[in-house]
Amino acid sequence: MHTDENLLPISALQHLQYCERQCALIHIENVWTENVFTAEGRVMHDRVHGQGHETRGNVRTAFGLRLRSLRLGLTGQADVVEFHRQDNGVWLPYPVEFKRGHPKTNDCDRVQLCAQALCLEEMKGESIAAGALFYGETRHRLDVAFDAELRAKTEALCVRLHAFIEAGATPVAVYNKGKCDRCSLLGVCLPKSAGTGKSARKWLARQIDELCPGLPPESEITTARDAQSYPERRESSVECPSPLRGDQP
């Protein structure tokens, strides 16, 4: 059982599924930038959350409902929760998550919605059979059944998420065109500069080689992290351009 102090955002489940490095940058290093896709999504969510609540016939609708599960260690906010009146007078929750794009081929959105349902079940003490995903591009609802397989996958991902965050290690960047080019953190993550098989030391060495092509190849680059003592300076007749002397345009 978790406590209020170590609850993690429900949205982190989607980040972890999409890209572990993205999840680490956001939830371990607290890095966030927006692009047109995230901005459009934020505007959509803000509009939905600001509507309060309403009742139409046998359906009560709550917007921006706060959610929490101490069992799963999650907290968040549902875009919409419809409460459908049953024949026995019980109002059964039906979560609806809004997404700006179109249905995905993976389970990221379904897992996030299922996590909301699991939070509601713990809060309300009632079983929730289904919910829906509404996509802004298609303007269509996609019904989602919370079957045993989806529930098990969601709960397992919650355990993995907490272990991942507690480890506190940000994975190295690996460029994936289909994911990276749409990610708002592309300019921070720099997957093309620091991908698999690449290191900051090698990258820095290449930059120095480009600026000072005559520098002896055996010269060492010493970083602040591993430099306990600096090596003796070597005399060199090669001069590197300095922006302080006006050598740079």
Cite the ranges covered by each PLM segment.
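Metal-dependent nuclease catalytic cores that hydrolyze phosphodiester bonds in DNA/RNA
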Residues: 1-95, 99, 206-211, 223-226, ...
